[in-house]
Amino acid sequence: MPKESKGKSAVRGESSIDSPSRTGAKPYNKRSAPTTSNGPSSKSQHTSKKPRFEKPNPSGSSSSLPGASKIKASIRQTKRLLAKPNLAPGTKIEAERRLKSLESDLEVASRKQVEKSRASRYHRVKFVERQKLVRRIARCKRNLARLNSDKAAQDLDSEGEASDDDDEGYGNQRLKESKMSKEELTKMLRWLRELLQYVMQYPADLRYVALFPTAEEGPSPPDAKEKDKSRQMAYQHLERVKKAIDDGQISEEVEVELSSKHRTLKKLATSTGGSSNGTTPTTSQAKNKQKMAKKTDKTTKNKRKNEEPISDDDDESDEDAAGAGGVKGDDFFAQDSDDEE
């Protein structure tokens, strides 16, 4: 065995001396890549990593709209085209129709931007107030259960003195609730559930009006005598929530839906017809505007047909442009629209 090992080393030494490229170089410094083998390669090991979670694309035509800056740029281009003199009648009708659809798309995109910014701004406030209301509802239900089980009033007083899961600074409120009657507790439970639905169903395009303005005071919802515009809108939202609970559109026991595993919370329909400024319309209003715009375009088109003869090519281009809605897949400026020369 030792003789064979010496012979191999001698053969290796001879081959390294004979080849000029191997002189003065380390033999294992630059090893060539391994040939194809049956085992798994390093690339396949890297590709077998856990894929990242990708959020699903929201359904709907409004989700495919571009940003507000792109829509504004398209509106400026369309206005420049309409400002040109001696514009062909077919191109002018097409550009006017496109301008109206772009303006409606801009309203939807701007409303989405407002909703996104306000959702991130009021997320923490809504979370804190939701936790406070859930804890108060749980305490009210415990008091009702103890009244139904005919326990002593001393137990209620001791429970009202201190509690680990309640907020700090509400000792007096807990004592009051522990001494309430059954009717008062049921009314309070109903009121707290309405306020919790107020928080959960609050529209994203409105400024949020907090129910707990200070840490020491209890919930103070907006009333009918409010002078501030945002608080008036909040009061209207609270009235809608109360009516929806009475009609059965949303659940009365909202805390049960929140504590469930799947959290299938029923949502109200679009509540407001605009933002706090009252200028941003809903998608249904935008669709109605588009329908009215198409009707007016048809009437103007018929009038111009009687006045000036329009070629068949212009009519076909108008019919193709009627289905275009906004910037998505729009090659309006790609075609040769400068027909005035």
From Swiss-Prot:
Cellular component per GO, a single term: nucleolus
Coiled-coil residue windows: 90-155
Top-level taxon of the source organism: Eukaryota
Main location: nucleus
Function: Involved in rRNA processing.
Similarity comment: family membership: Belongs to the EFG1 family.
Protein name: rRNA-processing protein EFG1
Organism: Mycosarcoma maydis
